[in-house]
């Protein structure tokens, strides 16, 4: 269909193919009064392939529906313009909708894609305008692939057990599109920043002014009136935009591999006992001094997991600022949990637990960290079996619980562990702690009835200091 200047007025077109496109719509078309296009690919082809300019000047716009198995339900290929259009694509293992070419739309255009095991909507080009909704059962709702540029659009990605929204390459969003992004999953990851993801946010400014010629003189129309033009500029944001990811049973936000962010605060949360607000893995680079990470959980969930992660706060370091990650939990869960081997130089981790939970649980190998945990009645910092802490400062405070607890076989190197409490125990060693002579363990109780330090296990090498008001110092 297309290839020249044609008009489709209230037409209904259907097509079926195996490995090709059920229908190919291209060229310049005027599509009026609810024109309907439906395409089906029974093999590896695309249901409908769209390229060119499809404009509506009367009545409802075009409705394009494409269905495919391993191909694309609807594929936008090449530079395409749509007005008042509806794109609806479905696929099994392919893409419901694949925006492979630059797509410019108006705000009334809607793009909807669903895939069983594939990707609901895949975006690997420039998108301006449109409301985009992608969903998948076991795959990805919306994928922002390499070279995706999103401007003045609304993105909504959801998945049952996969990723709601996945970023897999270098992606730029304007601040309005980023603020409206919705990423959610039931048991998978709400927002995933995968290997090689590089996300930056731009602010767009439009100014209408009188048009000038090459000599700086006003350009006049046929009636002698000054012509105007709109000048668009873009620049990195100076105030970060919050990207939110939610998951009921999985991770609200997860990073893996090499990831870089600028102009963004990653905000992940979970409400399920088995869920995680934010999971940080791989190499995460904070490229400016305004981006950040916040995490939250309720019940028995975990707000933040740092698992085999190296966090590089280059932008903050260059500005002489501290990079702080805040995580909180309300209930019996954990605010911050470390696993694997993590390098946290120039990073401050703050965990807060209310309702009897644990603020920080240290596991695996942690180096270069500055960690603070606060709990009302639970454990502020727990050092678990097999943990190794190197070149780090760890502080815990619990009002009526335990400020610091070493509960397994752990090791310290050039590190200080301290715990404070009001009426509970400042520091408790119930496991086996091995340390070098430069490491210290201190505990303090500031009110009557509190205990500074209790040792029910063993401490080798470290200096142990306790202080209490009326209870036992050690």
List where the protein language model places each region:
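Beta-strand-rich solenoid/repeat architectures in extracellular/passenger domains
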Residues: 4-20, 27-45, 52-70, 78-94, ...
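N-acyltransferase acceptor-side catalytic subdomain
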Residues: 24, 166, 254
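Long, compositionally biased, intrinsically disordered segments
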Residues: 31, 193-196, 201
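Serine/threonine-rich low-complexity intrinsically disordered regions
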Residues: 202-219, 224-240, 468
């Amino acid at each position: 269909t297309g290839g020249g200047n044609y008009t489709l007025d209230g037409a209904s077109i259907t097509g079926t193919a195996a490995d090709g496109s059920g229908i190919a719509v291209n060229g310049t078309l005027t599509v009026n009064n609810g024109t309907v296009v439906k395409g089906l690919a029974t093999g590896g082809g695309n249901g409908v392939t769209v390229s060119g300019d499809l404009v509506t000047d009367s009545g409802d716009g075009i409705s394009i529906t494409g269905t495919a198995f391993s191909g694309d339900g609807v594929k936008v290929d090449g530079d395409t313009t749509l007005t008042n259009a509806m794109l609806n694509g479905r696929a099994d293992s392919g893409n419901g909708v694949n925006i492979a070419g630059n797509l410019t739309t108006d705000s009334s255009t809607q793009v909807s894609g669903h895939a069983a095991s594939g990707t609901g909507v895949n975006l690997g080009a420039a998108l301006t305008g449109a409301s985009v909704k992608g969903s998948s059962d076991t795959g990805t709702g919306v994928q922002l692939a390499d070279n995706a540029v999103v401007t003045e659009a609304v993105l909504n990605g959801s998945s049952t057990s996969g990723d709601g929204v996945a970023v897999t390459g270098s992606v730029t969003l304007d601040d309005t599109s980023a603020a409206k992004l919705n990423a959610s999953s039931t048991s998978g990851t709400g927002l995933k920043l995968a290997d090689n993801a590089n996300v930056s946010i731009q602010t767009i400014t439009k100014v209408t002014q009188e048009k000038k010629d090459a000599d700086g003189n006003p350009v006049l129309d046929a009636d002698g009136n000054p012509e105007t033009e709109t000048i668009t500029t873009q620049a990195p944001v100076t105030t970060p935009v919050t990207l939110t990811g939610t998951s009921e049973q999985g991770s609200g936000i997860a990073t893996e591999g090499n990831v870089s962010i600028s102009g963004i605060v990653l905000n992940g949360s979970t409400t399920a006992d088995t869920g995680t607000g934010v999971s940080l893995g791989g190499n995460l680079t904070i490229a400016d001094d305004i981006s950040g990470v916040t995490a939250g959980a309720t019940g028995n969930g975990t707000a933040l997991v740092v698992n085999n992660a190296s966090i590089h706060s280059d932008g903050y370091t260059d500005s002489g600022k501290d990079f702080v990650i805040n995580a909180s939990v309300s209930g019996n869960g954990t605010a911050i949990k470390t696993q694997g081997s993590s390098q946290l130089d120039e990073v401050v981790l703050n965990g807060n637990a209310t309702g009897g939970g644990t603020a920080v649980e240290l596991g695996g190998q942690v180096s270069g960290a500055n960690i603070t945990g606060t709990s009302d009645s639970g454990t502020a910092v727990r050092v678990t079996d097999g943990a190794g802490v190197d070149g780090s400062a760890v502080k815990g405070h619990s009002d009526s619980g335990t400020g610091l607890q070493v509960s397994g076989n752990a090791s310290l190197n050039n590190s200080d562990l301290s715990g404070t409490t009001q009426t509970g125990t400042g520091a408790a060693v119930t496991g086996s702690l091995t340390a070098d002579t430069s490491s210290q363990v201190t505990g303090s109780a500031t009110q009557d009835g509190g205990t500074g330090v209790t040792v029910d296990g063993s401490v080798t090498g470290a200096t142990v200091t306790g202080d209490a008001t009326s209870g036992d110092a050690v």
